[in-house]
């Protein structure tokens, strides 16, 4: 029989109330209270919920705050971790959620974050700052949009805003360190850039190189439209010049 044990149901075993900051725990195999370590362990398809945040895992461990024995200050998630918010879903192997800071650090092989616009994977951690409405992915990051365009970098920061319906949606992604964009028609590299979710364009800066079917353009600024797969070098208003190498098409033999 499925056992759903909310934290509130443990009050008979604990001197102080354990439901704090509107956090609840569900688990198929039960919830254990370890008084000495001041922690709760939920096992078997465990779920922690707080307002519009949900964390699922094989095992969840809730730690009480040293200063306030009736408040959970940190949650650890182990095994098949999934965190869901109104704007994203994240997946990994382990997560640490700081309740006070409203921050979650996810690790996986790889860690993954999905929004309606993009799917982002990272060899390193993904840190989600819910109160700041942003997610940061480090090390070997790859983003893929709905049209199959690939964006690579060592650091990506996704920012979210509320739309006219008061729903959180992706606003932009800041892309830094070893940036590369691969579309069906071109490969573009740069030091940094910013993806605008509304326009579907990525604006690239510093040491930009566009390779389109063997034709190469170089400059300090560029624009890649992920909707049309068109990339172009932009003037930076300085004295720097745009250079290009164009591949001559081979004539067909008669």
Language model feature labels by segment:
Residues 1-254:
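Mature-chain termini and adjacent capping regions
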């Amino acid at each position: 029989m499925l056992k759903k044990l909310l934290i509130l149901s443990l009050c008979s075993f604990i001197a102080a109330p354990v439901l704090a900051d509107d956090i609840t725990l569900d688990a198929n195999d039960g919830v254990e209270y370890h008084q000495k370590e001041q922690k709760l362990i939920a096992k078997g398809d465990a779920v922690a919920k707080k307002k519009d945040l949900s964390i699922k895992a094989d095992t969840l461990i809730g730690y009480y705050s040293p200063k306030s024995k009736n408040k959970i200050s940190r949650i650890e998630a182990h095994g098949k971790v999934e965190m869901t918010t109104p704007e994203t879903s994240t997946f990994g192997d382990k997560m640490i959620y700081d309740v006070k800071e409203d921050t979650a650090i996810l690790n996986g092989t790889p860690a993954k974050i999905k929004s309606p616009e993009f799917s982002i994977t990272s060899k390193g951690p993904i840190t989600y700052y819910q109160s700041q409405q942003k997610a940061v992915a480090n090390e070997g990051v790859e983003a893929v949009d709905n049209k199959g365009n690939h964006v690579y970098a060592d650091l990506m920061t996704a920012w979210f805003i509320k739309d006219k319906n008061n729903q959180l949606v992706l606003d932009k992604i800041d892309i830094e360190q070893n940036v590369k964009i691969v579309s069906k028609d071109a490969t573009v590299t740069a030091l940094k850039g910013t993806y605008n979710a509304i326009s579907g364009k990525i604006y690239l800066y510093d040491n930009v190189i566009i390779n389109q079917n063997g034709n190469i353009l170089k400059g300090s600024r560029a624009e890649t439209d992920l909707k049309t797969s068109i990339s172009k070098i932009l003037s930076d208003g300085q004295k720097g010049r745009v250079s290009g190498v164009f591949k001559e098409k081979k004539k067909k033999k008669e």
